[in-house]
From Swiss-Prot:
Protein name from the UniProt record: Lateral signaling target protein 2 homolog
Family annotation (Gene3D superfamilies): Zinc/RING finger domain, C3HC4 (zinc finger)
Role according to the record: Negative regulator of epidermal growth factor receptor (EGFR) signaling.
Source species: Drosophila mojavensis
Pfam families in alphabetical order: FYVE
Presence of the UniProt keyword DNA damage in the record: no
Binding site for Zn(2+) 2: C987, C990, C1017, C1020
Keywords noted in UniProt: Metal-binding, Phosphoprotein, Zinc, Zinc-finger
Compositionally biased region (Basic and acidic residues): 360-370
Length: 1051
């Protein structure tokens, strides 16, 4: 009977007693809900349902604590919570699950989840039944084995009821965990096992990125140890760069299928592929500058030449010089072609010698270009002579087309091919000669279906030159207008929209969309072309290709790069050409004829040329025409050039007469033409086996063509930008946009990943104590910041209350009484009551020293070491108040009213409540100010009050200090722990930390100068409202009420 009576005590803090009172409250609310019709009184029903769910939360929270103590490691694992969204893991999740289980057990269904509700209904019924059994057994234990205010359970394990409780808790724990997984999975999307593993790999990528950034000096270890907020933006940005070009086989491998990517980066797959293509064209120095830019947001240094950014556009004088130089090179090319055709039977040694010398020339030119030397110096080398095939590949050689070697092997193909392509071209020729020849080839290729008109038209070349020059000027002007400079007011959403052609064409320079649609057609054409070539003829053509200067440095450099990467090579140095055969044959389009390739076969060559252009595709036409006219003498070569110009001129007139076939010369067409020609040339260079021409080497040729296509696309991607600075700026916008979008779309996942990364990469000295040390100097003001401990362990840093609007002294924090909520008084209230009471007795020093000792003891318990010297400052303040005590008589009534507003009339009660608060408070409390020390030392004495000090106090009284959020893990009224969703709120009257429910009142505080309503706790609101009502109603009783504190202190 004694135990039953004691269990009714509200101040018992044992687990069983707390469960008993919570369960009784829940039962009372449930009974009241059942006592009336909710449809008749909806407001009352809503209010009671809210109370019911709060009580359910409290009962399940206490039950969970009991299970933690009794079951321990035998509890059912809840590792599945790692797959839940962070927003689901709230403190009231258990209450929501209980409420949902009762609704499902009663026959209700989740909205739009009828099938899932039907499946969960048996489990919900089992959960509610098991929970009811646990509540009955726990209530019985409360009456049997409760120990008042015990921190642990004292159960009789030899009792059968205790054993029954133990088994019931295990069953309920298992059922509740199973129901939690089913219910949450039906309500919100839950990660699959693969998605969770991919998120872990993303965390590994972030950690590796941070370690790499620390190693190369982009970040500092002190930033990691201090949890620098800037790292939360820098690490995801750097991780995107590292995942695309450094850790290419990691979770950001864009070659894997889209459904295998992490759900965080799956929406950005297209833009990440384009970013990767651009990153592969950056040199090591450019990549480092981009990563530094992503960390610091500094401006790009345009004074330092990076890669080829210092190369400027050519002047007209340079264009003229380049034209003459190119003509000389063509002459040299023709002479060398004739000499090579006459010595084609010299075997493979000659081919090896010429190839090796060409490789050396390429290396010299690449080094020469990367060192920003003279732009025309390499044009005089015979190995760099231009052919139409080479011109078509280097048509867009802008100043940014020559990056240095790549930091990773995965992008060496693109970078080497790009460097080889542009190293053979003087930069002064980037706008005139290259595009001239390219457009000529394009126009010739578009005349395949007009053989008869081709023979009839014989206009001169001047009109063709003028037409092509006009077209090229229009193209260059369009390219300049559509260059990659950023639009100032364009947001990230507009940049990522694929429908906006002016942005997406130049946003990231990738030609996947252009070449993707023609990939199947190109492969079919290549296969047909390979089937038409005979093995012996192809070997002879390969021998010719080795001897031709038209193969030039770009092809050889690409072949050399592919050989280093163990990829299919187009070099046939190991092939032995027949030395006895002095004539090489070329397969005619009909497949039945072969004609000798000599200087005396001009007419046959011209006739077959037209039949060839009539029957073959555009790319095959370029290939065969290229091989024919380079194996004849110089006059014949000039004759073919004249025919080609006439064909172009004919196409010009044909275009004007047939408006139904508009002539579209644009950048995409030129690049597609270059792509087809490169692929066809590379495809033709692959040696076919003698037995089966379409077997394994055909697949090797296709693989080589794909590699070269990738290199060309990466090169043409960079050509969209005018300078390296513009390219880096655009990459910064793209990468930062994707990383910052993760902060919005996947905030919870990103927080979990970054939290793990910080914990992994912290220095060992920071692992022990993460909390921010408190400031110890009195002159320094305390500005609250969310502690890292809250951010990491409680996930509460980002959702805590805002920083204090006032700068607060650490000495001004108050002492709160949390357990005795009905009679809570702060030391700040005591300060307000007694701050102007002066000492008149002889035991001033004794009381002052005792108060100072008490203050120092409390301060040291909080780590505030500076309060030890506050006794001297208190003596000085007391002397100043003694000098002003004669001036306080006129404001006595105002001071008495302020005493009434505090809610306590006895200083001794304030002292006792403060000491009780110091003993019972669950949080670390802080000491008072100098004025509070003086007020505490003045207890038990009489005083007089001067008007000036009271007036100054009434007008300049500062608000009480706020308890730091890190010192208050629970609400100071209801003791509910704070979480990411239960935020902290400070009372402006007492400075305490409360939850939103306990601090939902607002009232003006004129004594602090706050005339508008501000947030106050419930108890301060009651006191303030009561004082505001009593102050005008009882003006005549002010003197009597004010005399009571003095009488009490005198007694």
């Amino acid at each position: 009977m004694f135990v039953f009576i004691y269990c009714l005590q509200a101040d018992d803090k044992s687990l069983l007693a707390r469960f008993y009172h919570a369960d009784r409250s829940l039962t009372a609310v449930a009974s009241e809900l059942d006592s009336f019709d909710g449809r008749a009184e909806p407001d009352r029903c809503t209010r009671l349902v809210s109370r019911l769910r709060q009580n359910q939360d409290k009962v399940l929270a206490i039950t969970n604590l009991i299970m933690e103590e009794l079951l321990g490691d035998e509890r059912d694992p809840r590792a599945f919570r790692a797959k839940f969204p962070e927003e689901v893991l709230q403190d009231n999740l258990a209450g929501q699950l209980w409420f949902g289980a009762e609704c499902l057990a009663a026959g209700s269904s989740i909205l739009n989840r009828e099938s899932e509700s039907k499946e969960m209904r048996p489990l919900a019924q089992a959960v509610t039944k098991s929970l009811g059994n646990v509540r009955v057994l726990l209530r019985d234990q409360c009456l049997r084995n409760n120990v008042p205010n015990s921190k642990t359970l004292h159960l009789d394990f030899n009792d059968s009821t205790t054993e029954q409780l133990y088994e019931s808790l295990k069953i309920f724990d298992h059922l509740f965990a199973e129901f939690e997984l089913s219910y949450v999975s039906a309500m919100v999307p839950v990660k699959s096992r693969h998605e969770y593993e991919m998120q872990q790999w993303i965390g590994v990528l972030f950690s590796e990125t941070l370690q790499r950034a620390l190693k190369i000096g982009l970040l500092e270890q002190e930033m990691v140890d201090a949890f620098d907020p800037g790292l939360m933006f820098s690490i995801p940005r750097l991780a995107i760069v590292a995942g695309l070009v450094v850790f290419t086989k990691g979770p950001l491998n864009m070659d894997m299928p889209g459904d295998e990517l992490s759900e965080m980066f799956r929406p950005f797959r297209t833009i990440l592929i384009k970013i990767r293509d651009l990153l592969r064209n950056l040199s090591k120095q450019e990549l480092h500058q981009l990563e530094k830019l992503l960390c610091t947001n500094e401006e790009i240094n345009t004074n330092v030449p990076l890669g080829s950014s210092s190369i400027e556009a050519p002047s007209p004088e340079h264009n003229n010089t380049s034209s003459s130089t190119s003509n000389n090179n063509n002459n040299n090319n023709n002479n060398s072609s004739s000499s090579s055709s006459s010595s084609s039977g010299s075997g493979s040694n000659t081919a090896k010698t010429s190839t090796s010398s060409t490789h050396k020339a390429v290396e010299r030119l690449v080094d020469h270009r990367n060192n920003n030397s003279s732009t025309v110096a390499g044009a005089t080398q015979p190995s760099t002579a231009r052919s139409p095939s080479m011109l078509s590949l280097s048509a867009g050689s802008t100043p940014t087309a020559s990056p240095a070697p790549s930091p990773t092997p995965s992008h060496s193909i693109a970078s080497t091919s790009s460097a080889a392509t542009t190293s053979t071209n003087p930069p002064a020729n980037w706008s005139d000669y290259d595009e001239d020849d390219e457009d000529l080839e394009e126009e010739v290729g578009m005349l395949d279906s007009d053989e008869d008109d081709l023979n009839d038209d014989s206009d001169d070349d001047i009109e063709v030159d003028e037409y092509i020059e006009a077209q090229l000027k229009a193209i260059v002007a369009a390219a300049d207008c559509a260059s990659g400079y950023l639009i100032p007011n364009t947001n990230l959403g507009n940049l990522f929209q694929a429908q906006q052609l002016p942005l997406t064409d130049n946003f990231v320079a990738s030609e996947d969309d252009e070449f993707g649609s023609n990939a199947a057609t190109e492969r079919q054409q290549q296969q047909q072309h390979m089937d038409e070539l005979q093995p012996g003829d192809q070997q002879q053509q390969q021998q010719q290709l080795q001897d031709e200067p038209s193969t030039s440095a770009a092809m050889l450099a690409a072949q050399r790069t592919l050989q280093r990467l163990h990829l299919p090579s187009s070099s046939s140095e190991n092939e032995q050409a027949p030395s006895s055969n002095q004539q090489t044959t070329i397969k005619t389009p009909n497949g039945n004829q072969s004609m000798p390739n000599s200087s005396s076969s001009s007419s046959n060559h011209n006739n077959n040329r037209h039949r060839h252009s009539h029957s073959h595709s555009h790319s095959s036409h370029h290939h065969h025409h290229h091989h024919r006219h380079h194996h004849h003498t110089h006059p014949h070569h000039q004759q073919q050039q004249e025919q080609r110009l006439q064909a172009a001129d004919h196409h010009h007139h044909h275009h004007h007469h047939h408006q139904s076939h508009p002539h579209r010369i644009n950048r995409s067409a030129r690049k597609r033409c270059s792509q087809e020609h490169w692929e066809s040339t590379a495809n033709a260079e692959q040696p076919a086996p003698e037995q089966t021409p379409g077997s394994a080497d055909t697949s090797n040729a296709s693989s080589f063509s794909d590699e070269v296509s990738l290199a060309m696309r990466s090169t043409t991607a960079r050509l969209k930008f005018k300078s390296t600075e513009n390219l880096l700026h655009r990459l910064f916008v793209c990468i930062a946009g994707v990383a910052d979008q993760l902060q919005t779309n996947f905030a919870s996942d990103l927080r979990q990943i970054l939290r793990s990364v910080f914990l992994i990469n912290m220095s060992s000295s920071q692992d022990e104590d993460i909390d921010i040390p408190e400031k110890t100097k009195e002159s320094e003001l305390f500005e609250f910041r969310a502690s890292e401990n809250d951010v990491i362990q409680e996930s509460a840093g980002s959702n805590q209350s805002i920083y204090s609007a006032e700068e607060v002294n650490p000495e001004l924090d108050n002492v709160f009484n949390n357990t005795n909520a009905a009679v809570r008084h702060s030391a700040g209230a005591a300060m307000q009551r007694n701050n102007t009471i002066d000492l008149a007795s002889g035991n001033n020093n004794g009381n002052s020293n005792a108060a100072a000792r008490n203050h120092v003891a409390r301060s040291r318990s909080l780590g505030d070491q500076e309060a030890a010297g506050s006794g001297t400052r208190q003596d000085e303040q007391r002397q100043q108040q003694q000098q002003q005590q004669q001036q306080l008589q006129q404001q006595l009534q105002m001071q008495r009213q302020r005493n009434n507003s505090v809610g306590s009339n006895s200083p001794s009660s304030a002292s006792s409540s403060s000491s009780s608060s110091e003993h019972n408070s669950p949080i670390s409390t802080r000491s008072g100010s100098r004025r509070r020390l003086h007020s505490n030392s003045s207890i038990g004495t009489t005083s007089t009050i001067t008007p000036s000090t009271a007036a100054a106090t009434a007008t300049t009284m500062s608000p009480p200090a706020w308890i730091p959020d890190g010192k208050a893990p629970r609400c100071m009224s209801c003791q509910t722990p704070f979480t990411a969703f239960r935020r902290r709120h400070h009372c402006r009257n007492c400075g305490g930390v409360f939850c939103g429910v306990c601090s939902n009142a607002s009232a003006p505080l004129p004594k602090y100068g706050l005339t508008k309503a501000v947030r106050v706790c419930r108890e301060c609101y009651v006191r303030e409202v009561r004082s505001s009502r009593q102050a005008p109603a009882q003006p005549s009783q002010a003197h009597g009420q004010a005399s009571r504190p003095q009488a009490a202190s005198a007694s």
